[in-house]
Each structure stands twice: as C-alpha cells, then as structure tokens.
Regions:
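Extended intrinsically disordered or low-complexity segments
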Residues: 2-376
Length: 376
C-alpha cells in the first residue's frame, strides 16, 4: 500500500491486526487548534475560537505515551496516537483546577460539558479541595478540613487511590528495599486515600517505604499519624473516610482484580488518561495465559476487546461525534483566560477524508472518525 499525505497536517498510515488475525490498514491524522479569546460572545455563547495550526505549525503525531513525570509512575499526559482502533471517541482534559477569581478557597467545583450536534453527551462535575489529610485519633481515622489554595492539578496523583509498601527490615530504604508488603489500588496506584489493611497493621514496627498514600512520611516510623487525602472527587460522591482495603491474595488476574475492586469504597475521579494496567481498562485487554501463548501468539487473545484502546474514563467516552463538537470548561483554565472561570468553544466543521485509489482506478472517499479530543 502506498500512502500520500496531501493535507497540511501530520498523518501516518500503518498496519495492525484485528482479533481473528486479519491485517487491517490504519490512517491516523492529527489536527491541533489553538484556543483564542473571541472578540465578543456569539449567538452560541462561545468565549473562545479554535484556530487550526497547519503547515510548519502543525503538531506531529505522538509516537509513544508521554508522562507528567517518571515513566510508568506518574499520570499520562497523552498516549500514542497510533492506536489500531477505538470503538468510541475519547474526550480527555489535561488541566489545572483554579479557585474562582483566583482567590484561595478550601474547595470549589469544576465541570466539563461536551455537546455533539447540540446534544449534551458529557456533563461531569468534580469537587476540588486544598491539601487535606486523614489523621489518627482514639476513634480511628478522621478526615481533616482542607487548607485554602488557588490551584490543583487535575491528575490521578490527587485522586482516590494509592500504593502500600512495607520493607522487610529497618535498614531497607527506597525502591531497592526488600518488601514484605507491596500492594496497589487496582483502579489508581498513583493516588491517595487508599491503603491495604496490612499496611496499617505492620507499619508501626517495620520500615515504610515509597508509599504514595503516605508519601510525606519518612522511613522507619514508631507510629503513623497522618495520611494525605484525595483533593479531587466526584461532585456528588464526597470522600469522607480512609479506605482500608484487603487484598487476600497476590498475583491476581484481571478478572480477579475486578472482583476485588467491587469491594473498594469508591472510584477515582479525574479527567485524564486511565492507566493501561488499571481496572477497568485492563479487563478489555484479554487473557494472556499459557493457552494464548501456545495457540494465539503473537495475535490478540480471542477475548481481546478494542475498547482497551479507549483511554478516557468511561463517562468521557462518546460515540464518534459529528463535526463541530462544542465543549465547556468551568474553573479548569487560568482565570485571566476565562470569563469568570467559564470557557466555551467549538471545533470547526473540518472533515478529514481518505481517498482510496484501487488498481482499477476507482477512487472511494472515506470520512475519518474523530476518536480522540484532548483539551490541554
């Protein structure tokens, strides 16, 4: 197959395989728009307009996943654009939540709404707080009041989740220590507010290391008195208590992880890419066991579901939209770039086409599908 890109944007053709093992041809194209303030509100109420970056200003395709910090140990900025197929359109928001008017506040709402052909397809609200913690008292763990703050990055590190690690010996320190306990929250190992029961049982007489849910605590501890709490939660599902989970076994497969997750107190709230190895995304990958290795390798397992390639939270996945998708952000952009914290814009009605030219000379135009919208 010969591929020619005649658009002033970056595009690429590549081959992939479907579940039965058939070769499929994929074309990926990236269009990036710069948000610019509108001179005045139009009839649709848009505060900003989208300006296409093309030619020398066009942004290249992302060839690999990019992270906010250390690879595999921090939130994903954006994933590779070379997904073989996405059954739905991911709507992702990489943002910092700002307190109204830039004035420090203990908590405030943030909201994302998306409209496809005038129909609202996403309405997601978050509650954002300043730094807060669970403190240990004679009646158990209590959630403290948040400190006022101006801004909080909307990342999984600030949401519900966590990691519980305990070293075998007092001398063990850091990631290289031998671990007696090494458990993660299957829905978000980067977060806070989740601990495995054995962490609290054993950390009073062992060395506590590299625990994201207790990242402010030093090595050997006689007592744990404070654990950071989530700063981002669903607007209608407030977090009120420390989630002490129990993982009765290690080395669980994806199905077993899903069963354990059903007993968690809540789910992480966020707007960005869900980790490939997290529940519920992992469950779509399929079963990679000895049977697969003997009968299917290197192809997908028979239970592979292409929804695995959709990286947005489930409530941010929509049907492939029509041109002209509109979106609104509340308290998710710098106040000086908004109208009282509010921002609204719409994508231009651009349509990307692939013209298939067969050996016979016949040309068949195919309209490309919008499978990812990243608001950054």
């Amino acid at each position: 197959m010969e591929f020619r890109n005649l658009a002033p944007l970056h595009a690429m053709a590549f081959n992939a395989v479907d579940v039965p093992g058939n070769e499929i041809h994929v074309v990926a194209l990236k269009a990036v728009y710069r948000l610019e303030p509108a001179q005045s509100l139009d009839t649709d109420g848009d505060t900003h307009r989208c300006v296409l970056l093309s030619g020398d200003n066009a942004v290249p395709l992302a060839m690999a996943d990019e992270y906010e910090g250390e690879t595999g140990k921090s939130s994903v900025k954006w994933e590779s654009d070379l997904a073989p197929f996405k059954p739905k359109c991911d709507v992702l928001v990489r943002a910092t939540a700002h307190a109204p008017h830039g004035t420090p506040a203990a908590s405030w709402p943030a909201r994302v709404r998306v409209f496809d052909a005038g129909t609202m397809v996403i309405d997601k609200g978050l509650r954002v707080t300043g730094p807060r913690a669970f403190t240990k008292g004679w009646r158990g763990w209590k959630l403290g009041e948040p400190e006022p703050t101006r801004a909080v990055p909307v990342r999984w590190e600030q949401a519900y989740g966590g990691t519980s690690r305990v070293a075998l010996t007092q001398s063990g320190k850091g990631a290289s220590a031998d671990l007696e306990l090494n458990e993660v929250c299957f829905t978000n190992p980067l977060g806070r507010g989740w601990v495995e029961k054995r962490f609290l049982d054993r950390a009073t007489h062992k060395s506590v290391v590299a625990s994201l849910c207790a990242s402010s605590l030093p090595g050997p501890l006689p007592k744990i008195a404070e654990i950071p709490a989530p700063q981002i939660e669903a607007w209608d599902v407030p977090i009120t208590s420390l989630d002490v989970a129990e993982h009765s076994a290690s080395g669980l497969d994806a199905k077993q992880m899903k069963e354990v997750v059903a007993r968690y107190a809540t789910t992480p709230a966020g707007l960005g890419v869900v980790g490939r190895a997290w529940t519920p995304r992992l469950q779509f990958a399929g079963t990679y066991d000895e049977i697969w290795h003997k009968t299917r390798w290197p192809y997908h397992p028979v239970d592979h579901d292409f929804h695995y390639w959709n990286g947005a939270p489930a409530d941010q996945q929509i049907e492939w939209p029509a041109p002209g998708l509109a979106f609104e952000l509340a308290n998710l952009a710098q106040p000086e770039h908004t109208r009282a914290g509010f921002l609204r814009a719409r994508l231009p009605g651009h349509r990307a086409l692939v013209a298939l030219r067969f050996k016979s000379g016949e040309i068949v135009p195919l309209e490309m599908k919008l499978d990812t919208l990243l608001i950054d």
